[in-house]
Design a protein with these regions (language model features):
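Short acidic-glycine loop/turn motifs at beta-strand connectors
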Residues: 64, 75-78, 271-274
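C-terminal soluble interaction/assembly domains
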Residues: 177, 189-277
Length: 277
């Protein structure tokens, strides 16, 4: 999750080394992910192909590839609340290169060349680096705010880290790893369909029994506390902040939501009158 704040801090370290000019091109390397088969098509864009939930995963991804717009009336118009929108308008490569250049310029660093995509040379010298937030933090952001692109990034990362010699698509490799893991935990995956790592699909399939088995395993696992903390709390935060308010359920469950046009779904944990989860 390379946000603008993390990127600014990282580039600031570069500037603190005394670097004020980079002779040559700004070259972005997106070769970490291999997605030879492309991504499954999703046509339900809500008449907004630039919506945040449609951002596709990429090794170039920075700041979720989003631009932030605020619209408000000046003194000539009727005063009222401002309108805020987040849109994805540029390719990952364009967005990342432009953002890096802009931040470097703000820091007083000039790049003399243009923007290119390429592979890092084997003899390149590492000057500085940054690391991702830990997995617990990433999963919390994914679940609390139902981030499709972050979930899909996670799937591709699983694939990239476990890619076999005969595999050339990290999406497919990641799905294979998940199926193998589930089967190893005793969960029958017959009929289950995972196609993109998020709920952004009309082809995904899972039975109620399979879902319940996965949740039961999660509840009894060594990482249950981390998973519980990542899920939205009824009527309190995340995607559940405004749902089931004043129903007597406030704070009484941790629920992951799902939403597509004409589809609503929830899954998670709560307690009954006998205090049973």
């Amino acid at each position: 999750k390379l946000t603008i704040e993390r990127l600014w801090t990282t580039l600031g370290e570069l500037r603190s080394m005394g670097i004020t000019r980079i002779e040559g091109d700004l070259i972005l390397d997106g070769s970490y992910f291999q997605v030879d088969g492309g991504f499954p098509a999703f046509e339900d864009n809500g008449d907004n192909p630039h919506a945040p939930f449609l951002v596709e995963p990429s090794a170039y991804l920075t700041n979720l590839n989003l631009m932030h717009f605020q619209v408000r009336a000046d003194e000539r118009g009727t005063q009222g609340c401002r309108t805020t929108a987040y849109l994805s308008l540029l390719s990952h490569e364009q967005y990342s290169a432009s953002l890096i250049r802009s931040l470097l310029a703000d820091l007083g660093v000039v790049v003399s060349g243009g923007d290119l995509n390429g592979v890092t040379p084997e003899d390149a010298r590492l000057v500085m680096k940054t690391t991702s937030p830990d997995l617990v933090t990433m999963v919390r952001d994914i679940n609390k705010w139902s981030s499709n692109v972050m979930a899909r990034q996670l799937l591709l990362t699983i694939g990239a880290e476990n890619r076999q010699e005969d595999e050339s698509d990290d999406r497919v490799a990641g799905i294979r790893v998940i199926y193998d893991w589930l089967e190893n935990k005793g969960i029958n995956t017959a009929g289950m369909v995972i196609d993109n790592g998020a709920g952004l699909t009309r082809h995904g399939r899972i039975t109620a029994r399979q879902g319940a088995q996965i949740l039961e395993h999660a509840w009894n696992s060594a990482y249950s506390a981390d998973l519980m903390a990542s899920m939205p709390i009824i009527a309190m935060d995340g995607t559940m902040a405004r749902r089931l308010r004043n129903t007597g359920m406030d704070g009484e469950g941790r629920i992951k939501t799902g939403y597509l046009e004409n589809v609503r779904s929830i899954a998670g944990f709560t307690r009954d009158s006998n205090n049973t989860t």
